[in-house]
Amino acid sequence: MKGIMVQGTASDVGKSLICTALCRIFARRGYKVTPFKSQNMSNNSYITVEGLEIGRAQGIQAEAAMEEASVYMNPILLKPRNDREAEIVCFGQAVDTVSGVKYRDGFYKRGLEAIKQALATLSQSFDMVVIEGAGSPVEVNLNDRELVNMKVAELADVPVILVADIERGGVFASLYGTLELLQPNERKRVVGIIVNKFRGDPELFSSGVQWIEQHLGVPVLGVLPHLPGVRIEGEDSLSKGQVTSVLPRDQSIDIAVLDLPYLSNYTDLEPFRYEEDVAIRFVSSVDALGRPDAIILPGTKSTFHDLQILKEKGFKERLHEYVTTDGTVVAICGGFQMLGHRLIDVAGSDTGIKGATIDGLDLAPVETRFAEKKKTVRSLGQLLHPFGTAKDIYGFEIHLGETDIVDPSIPAFLRVGNHTDGVYLHEGRLIGTYFHHLFFNDDFRSGWLNTLRRKKGLRERPTVELEKCRRASYDQLADEVERVLHVDSLLEKMERWGETS
């Protein structure tokens, strides 16, 4: 299995997006391509058809490659629970929650074997692999036990492209420093450089390309432009940004998302990028909230902690005032759990303290108990109270808590198997659910937004076909990258590497 690995001079230089583009480019050229990232650190998950959990970025890259995502594409996923600990997900299933020191000391050998197994499995079904690195390959304090960069390139025996972000400044120093800190055998793997996020006429950087090639001895395979029009999901919180409407504020739907410290699966909001009259802003204080057209209370990796923060900041009282004065709220997963009267950490799975309790926001008649085993599943269901033409919905669930309705209430959804989910209160102005990707359902999203539009005196808009838009985004990204990247030269380098290794 031939391949290429994309490494970067730092985090958030564009590795994920470039890997996504390469997956699409190579797939369009007839290759059977798989993405791969040995170890991902993110609270944004992708649930495979088997109900197993991988990093969202590799799920997106699999879609770009026109392949079904599998756990072998991301064998290790680390999900931060606080500043010191992270949950380890190995081959799609949670296995432990440990500190960084304990992880390095106790998990390295197991992680190495998982990576070898994943690469071997993928090689049986694919003829090309596009591997994404993490952070920088020259974190010298970590490199004795690294599992994400040059060690993976060695295991897969593939050449490396080094990506640098010119937008943040210091592109020459970052490239020079990275190459200088690599070991000689590692530097030999670097067959090309990509300068990313360039603004303006690339001819203005021609002397920069010459300097890099003359002084560093590595060819520049492309100078990629800044691509603000490409709507591909970011990997993690480093890429989290606001969604800006193309219309004036008084003609737009203003949605405020409560910016939780351990916010997870914020990709639930991605569909709004394709709605031209929707603006999304992340809000971390009551003063900044204002009077939005809707509030979204998203998921979190640390429900108790983030709920306590919301209460300390005065959001409990503010949300009560907002809901009782005709405001609209949608709460997803951890946000849904927060809506209730009380949360009980029976197993200590959220707080580490068995039996810990906390009062909720008291907006819905529900109570949540946290168990030991996490539920991860793709879900299908029906809306019991349709918005517009919406009826059937799909999504996925990732949660430790189980939520019970403790007073008469109206569930929002009926899942396959005749199980109910969520709450539907105040004639649909307050919805809580465990369904991630609720807004990926075109009819639901359209019906919900049109309700907000009518309420604001705006005209209704036709349904945006999300899947069609996403496919077009992958092709647009591939077109933009293929226009400036020397793809044929890259393929030649990959072929030659395979022949000589």
UniProtKB/Swiss-Prot annotation:
Keyword annotations from UniProtKB, A to Z: Cobalamin biosynthesis, Glutamine amidotransferase
Gene it is expressed from: cobQ
Pathway: Cofactor biosynthesis; adenosylcobalamin biosynthesis
SUPFAM superfamilies per UniProt: Class I glutamine amidotransferase-like, P-loop containing nucleoside triphosphate hydrolases
Active site: C333, H436
Segments crossing the lipid bilayer: none
Family: Belongs to the CobB/CobQ family. CobQ subfamily.
Residue ranges occupied by any GATase cobBQ-type domain in the UniProt entry: 252-444
HAMAP family noted in UniProt: CobQ
Biological role: Catalyzes amidations at positions B, D, E, and G on adenosylcobyrinic A,C-diamide. NH(2) groups are provided by glutamine, and one molecule of ATP is hydrogenolyzed for each amidation.
Organism ancestry: Bacteria, Bacillati, Bacillota, Bacilli, Bacillales
Protein name: Cobyric acid synthase
Top-level taxon of the source organism: Bacteria
